[in-house]
Amino acid sequence: LENHRDSRVKIALLCARIEDIIATTFRQNVLTRFEQAAHRRRGEGLLSSDELCELWLEENGRLFGGSVEMIEPYRWGWSYIGHFIHSRFYCYSYIFGELLVLALYQRYLEEGDAFVPRYLDLLKAGGSKAPRDLVAPFGIDLHNRSFWQTGYDLVKELYQELELLAEAEGV
């Protein structure tokens, strides 16, 4: 991205990256919150499909606010996501992974080559340890909100770069 000369290509690449991040973090958050709300409400009694539709629209409304008009068929969006039944409560892991990678990338930008050996060790370890143990060599506390904020800060920087390029190109 840094070395590309065509600013319109840079704009397209930045848009794609930002959209991917939004889809992974915010969209998966909607799915997670919908599942939590549905199970919480189910604990109070049976739920009708209309009640599930309302929960779906409510959680999606939190993401989109007034920026997107959700047409009538969208209320059934929850019904085609099979993992709500077969593999419950795993969407949070997409959010966790995306923000972890963004925050680790920010660390790499700050530390440079000194970061690489620890990162390679992290990759080699795979799922052999708990997440908190995997990131301990980086001095990361997964319970510290400021660590997670660094991922969002990186997205903000990408967005600001996109704004500058778009303004310069008149798009």
Residue ranges of each PLM-predicted region?
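Short beta-alpha connecting loops at secondary-structure transitions
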Residues: L13-D20, H39
